[in-house]
Structure formats: structure tokens, C-alpha cells
A protein has these predicted regions:
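ABC-family P-loop ATPase nucleotide-binding domain
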Residues: 1-34
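Post-Walker A (P-loop) alpha1-beta2 connector of ABC-family nucleotide-binding domains
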Residues: 78-80, 236, 289
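Conserved coupling/switch loops of ABC nucleotide-binding domains, chiefly the family-specific signature
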Residues: 82-85, 240, 286-287, 293
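Conserved catalytic segment of ABC-fold P-loop ATPases
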Residues: 231-237
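Cyclic-nucleotide recognition modules
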Residues: 310-368
Length: 384
């Protein structure tokens, strides 16, 4: 029997682009999915651009009908995009034939569904051996050994020879995760894997995913549980078939997903070289800035003394709000730090003020930030 072919599996560490030009392990480029029916066309995904790097743990969140499962189906090849590209490692998934898709998926993806889908007439160990059989990997003895070792990982090796019906729901889901790992895939995709479990079992299953990531696996998981999603290294928020900008979501969490999408459509991406000024103290400013890459430093002028740096801001933080809410000239100089360029998402004054009128909670939160920053500035200008 064949052993896993490292030439056919995706490389976990990549310093250069993959064969199709993607630098991330998983990339969706301008993906559109339209479902046709007698009632008309329904666009489930709208120009989706997503990157997931090797070794990331990404949670996909959003309300029912937002496009989460459709997105997962694009990555796994269970469904095909109407247009756009789906790239996983060196493979253009959207171009694979049905036969090629099945073989590629069996060796490169571990898939876990909300419903366990274990075959009821096979033992727990035999269920785990199925993917190895399908891909013709390992000898029979090696398959049996791998099945037991995988069950040890999920702490169910003592249940190996039982039928699935003898296990609880949480135990069956852990078996499903072990089965997803049967062929040692670099990527694990999970669609609502904790949806039918109580909180204790959901936490145990989530911990398994965290352990897999610590060992180098890449995990993409759809979840409706916001508390679990926060434990992932990154979240992708979907709303009405669109991806909400993650930096907008981090900077303005009180907005609804629909408001975040609306704001994202109004943003201008601006890049500043290392060490360059974005705002100069005493100048005029008519934009609200959210940092998306790099870091900035906040410097204050002081009478009879040198300028002082009082703060540093990172991706997901913002600046420029003081002048838009309080008026007047800029109160500080904002510069890109010397070590790297800075990318910011700029929102025009009119759209920013409109946003505040639409979200009272956001307005109150930013107003508190303004008060705190003005106090910090006053303290920072003092010369002892």
C-alpha cells in the first residue's frame, strides 16, 4: 500500500508563491456564487477575497444565511464558484475534475461536519480507517495502528471496537475529528462542529482543534458560538455574502455587520513609507483612519522641549477622530514607525459623522476614547 506522497501533499512552510501565484496556503479570489431557481438568481457569495496562511486557526462567523457554509463548500470543492478562483496550496480547486477532486480532497483535507456521519454498521476504528482505504494509503496493519493512535489523541481509544451508537454525541464528534485526520492532511475544515453539543463537549472539541494548530495544522472552522470564535487566531465575519473588513470589525465592534459592510465600501486604502508623517500637528484633517498594517507613533510638541512620543497604535486601532468630533487643528503628529510601511483605511468626514448618527453606541465609545486621549495629550505636554 502507498504511503503519503509528500510531493502530492501541500507544503506547510512556504517562502515563495505556490504554483498558481498564491502566497497564502488558502486563497479565494473574487469568488462569486449564484444559485439559480424559478424564483430568480440568489447571490450567496459576492466577490469574496480571503487569505488563510499555513498554521492559522480561522473562525468563520456570521448570521444564518450569511454565506458561511457556502464559503466552506468552495474551499472543500463540495460546490463550485460561479466565477473566481479557489486556490489551496499548489492546487486550483475550482479547475479539478470530479475524480481529481475526490483524490485531492482525500489526501489534503480533513473535513468535519455538524452531523457526525459515522457509518453505523462499522466500528469506531473502522470508521477512521475509511479515508485510508479510499486513498489506498498504508498497509492494513498500519491503518489499524493509525486508527488507534488517532483515537488516543481524542481520548477514545478504549471505544475503538464499539459501534457509533454506543457513544455520546460529543464522543462521536471527536471520532469524526479523528477520521478527518486519518490521512494526515495539512488542512482541517469544520462546518459547525460544535453545533449540536453542550458547552462542555463543545469546549473539549474546540480544544482538540487548538491542539492541532499547535502541531502545525491549518484549521478553518464555521461556528455560531462567538465565545469559541474568540479563541481562534483570527475571525472572518460574513454578512449578506460579503466579508466584513477585519480591521473595521476590530475598530468599530458596536456596528452591525451590515453597517460594517457599508463602511468598508467607503474606505480608501492609503500606504505610507516607513517614518513618514500621516498627520502633522497643527494641520487640518478631514479623515478618520483605521490601521490595517504596520504601526504608527503619536508625537506631541512641547514648549521649550523636544517632541515626545506618547503612544503607538497597531492594526485595528484608529486615529483622527478627535478633530472630526471636536473640530480644530490636529492635536498631535502621527507618523509611520521607522521599521515598516503603514497601511490605513481612510473614511471621509461626512461618512464618519453619518456613521456616528447611525450607531449611538459607537458614538459614545469613540467619545470616551476622545476624552481619554485629550487627557493623555495634556499630561504628555507637561515639561518637568
Amino acid at each position: 500500500m502507498a504511503k503519503p506522497d509528500n510531493q502530492n501533499q501541500m507544503v506547510m512552510e512556504k517562502t515563495e508563491s505556490y504554483h498558481n501565484g498564491n502566497k497564502a496556503l488558502i486563497e479565494l479570489r473574487k469568488v462569486v456564487k449564484v444559485y439559480k431557481s424559478a424564483a430568480g438568481d440568489y447571490k450567496a457569495l459576492k466577490d469574496i477575497d480571503i487569505e488563510v496562511g499555513a498554521g492559522e486557526f480561522v473562525a468563520v462567523i456570521g448570521k444564518s444565511g450569511s454565506g458561511k457554509s457556502t464559503l466552506i463548500n468552495m474551499i472543500t470543492g463540495i460546490d463550485r464558484p460561479t466565477s473566481g478562483e479557489v486556490l489551496v496550496g499548489d492546487t486550483a480547486v475550482h479547475k479539478l475534475s470530479e475524480d481529481g477532486m475526490a483524490k485531492w480532497r482525500g489526501r489534503n483535507l480533513g473535513i468535519v461536519f455538524q452531523f457526525f456521519q459515522l457509518l453505523p454498521t462499522l466500528s469506531v476504528a473502522e470508521n477512521i480507517m475509511l479515508p485510508m482505504d479510499f486513498c489506498n494509503l498504508y498497509s492494513l496493519k498500519e491503518r489499524e495502528e493509525r486508527a488507534i493512535n488517532l483515537l488516543k489523541i481524542v481520548e477514545l481509544d478504549d471505544q475503538a471496537h464499539k459501534l457509533p451508537a454506543a457513544l455520546s454525541g460529543g464522543q462521536q464528534q471527536r471520532v469524526a475529528i479523528a477520521r478527518a485526520l486519518a490521512n494526515d492532511p495539512p488542512v482541517v475544515i469544520a462546518d459547525e462542529p460544535t453545533g449540536n453539543l453542550d458547552s462542555k463537549m463543545a469546549d473539549a472539541v474546540f480544544s482538540l482543534f487548538e491542539n492541532l494548530v499547535s502541531k502545525g495544522k491549518t484549521v478553518v472552522m464555521v461556528t455560531h458560538d462567538s465565545s469559541l470564535a474568540k479563541r481562534a487566531s483570527r475571525t472572518i465575519l460574513l454578512a449578506d455574502g460579503e466579508v466584513v473588513n477585519e480591521y473595521v470589525a476590530k475598530a468599530l465592534p458596536a456596528l452591525t455587520p451590515q453597517q460594517m459592510i457599508k463602511v468598508s465600501h467607503s474606505l480608501e486604502l492609503i500606504t505610507y513609507p516607513p517614518g513618514s508623517s500621516i498627520l502633522q500637528e497643527g494641520s487640518t484633517s478631514d479623515k478618520f483612519y483605521i490601521i490595517s498594517q504596520g504601526r504608527v507613533e503619536v508625537a506631541l510638541q512641547r514648549t521649550g522641549a523636544s517632541d515626545i512620543v506618547v503612544a503607538h497604535f497597531s492594526p485595528g486601532q484608529y486615529f483622527g477622530e478627535i478633530e472630526l468630533m471636536r473640530g480644530g487643528k490636529t492635536r498631535a503628529t502621527i507618523k509611520a514607525t521607522p521599521e515598516m510601511p503603514v497601511e490605513v483605511l481612510a473614511l471621509e468626514r461626512e461618512r464618519f459623522l453619518e456613521l456616528l448618527s447611525e450607531s449611538e453606541e459607537t458614538k459614545n465609545t469613540i467619545d470616551q476614547i476622545v476624552k481619554a486621549r485629550l487627557q493623555e495629550n495634556a499630561t504628555g505636554r507637561r515639561v518637568d
